[in-house]
Amino acid sequence: MRNEMNLQFSALSQNESFARVTVAAFIAQLDPTMEELTEIKTVVSEAVTNAIIHGYEGNAEGIVYISVILEEAMVKLTIRDEGIGIFNLDEARQPLFTTKPELERSGMGFTIMENFMDEVEVISNESFGTTIHLTKYLSNSNALCN
């Protein structure tokens, strides 16, 4: 059985934890392992932070959109912004690359996403924003949403 959730919120840094906890609560019905849940929460944090800091460049008027689809033991996340987009996507996906070197922990977001998720697709258009599609196959889900 398929179950879906959609969420949107202002591009404020304090909403990053809200997004992480909300997505985790929704995914909990699949009974993921603690490691899987932690990885998904981390990926949500990274993608939302990228949207806020890089996509909207701190402009709180922007909106971050999250869609979560649960099917059997599969979690599909889509995190989207309508910000400035990514100028050079290949370069941005390189470990330690950042356009904001003054920020702590910069340059690891895409690397973390690629290590924790089974599939990562990034679509970005300058001036139109970025959409990140992420898929995770849970190892031993007792899918409660059936």
Curated annotation (Swiss-Prot):
Record carries keyword Transferase: yes
Disulphide bridges, residue numbers: none
Molecular function via GO: ATP binding; protein serine kinase activity; protein serine/threonine kinase activity; sigma factor antagonist activity
Catalytic activity, reaction form: L-seryl-[protein] + ATP = O-phospho-L-seryl-[protein] + ADP + H(+); L-threonyl-[protein] + ATP = O-phospho-L-threonyl-[protein] + ADP + H(+)
InterPro entries: Anti-sigma-factor_SerPK, Anti-sigma_F, HATPase_C_sf
Keywords of this entry: ATP-binding, Kinase, Nucleotide-binding, Serine/threonine-protein kinase, Sporulation, Transferase
Keyword Kinase attributed: yes
Enzyme nomenclature, EC number: 2.7.11.1
Entry-linked NCBIfam families: spIIAB (TIGR01925)
Family from the record: Belongs to the anti-sigma-factor family.
Name by which UniProt lists this protein: Anti-sigma F factor
